[in-house]
A protein has these predicted regions:
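N-terminal helix-loop segment corresponding to the beta1-alpha1 unit
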Residues: 1-183
């Protein structure tokens, strides 16, 4: 790949929109992105329509330019393979519910000791700390909680979701900006 990130290796442990949008931007900027998906499950968005030749156009648009590997990070053999790739990585991006990667031995506290130059980007709806951190978040939930849905739609109607998943797209964009700023810093 060409581009300003051509020498950067990104491990993509993301699903649906926020994380894949971030890593799509990094790939578009030239990074080599390896998407890690659970075997037989994959990214949830593989099931989102519309479909072209039995493939999700949604999934393909967000994961263009990426390589893909199926690994079960709960399995000891797959963990070894992941760790071999991790040794070469510059960036890891994840958007699991907080605490998930810690359970598998790949949380920030574990990895920063082994890989002090690794940039570890976590995108979650309610952050990594605080009272709501355990809640799953989708764009529509955050639009509602943030009040955005109350100012869209028709007068005297129910709250209406903004047509585009603006919260997820914006969060993915800001995560990509954060990764790029971290690359400059190291």
């Amino acid at each position: 790949m060409n581009g300003p990130l051509k020498d950067i290796l990104v491990l993509d442990l993301t699903r649906v929109l926020v994380g894949p949008y971030c890593t799509m931007i990094l790939s578009d900027l030239g990074a080599r992105v390896i998407k890690v998906e659970a075997p037989e499950i994959g990214d949830d968005s593989r099931k989102f329509g519309p479909f072209i030749d039995d493939q999700s156009a949604y999934f393909m648009s967000l994961n263009r330019g990426k390589e893909s590997i199926a690994l079960n990070l709960k399995n000891s053999e797959d963990k070894k393979i992941f760790e071999q790739i991790l040794k070469k990585a510059d960036v890891l991006v994840e958007n699991f519910k907080p605490g998930t990667l810690e359970k598998w031995g790949f949380g920030w506290k574990d990895l920063c000791k082994k890989y002090p130059k690794l940039i570890y980007a976590s995108a979650s709806g309610f952050g990594q700390t605080g009272p709501l951190r355990e809640l799953p978040a989708y764009d529509m939930v955050v639009q509602g909680m943030g009040g955005l849905m109350s100012v869209t739609g028709q007068p005297n109607s129910e709250p209406t979701r903004v047509g585009t998943s603006i919260g997820d797209i914006t969060a993915g964009l800001f995560t990509a900006i954060g990764v790029n700023l971290s690359l400059i810093h190291i």
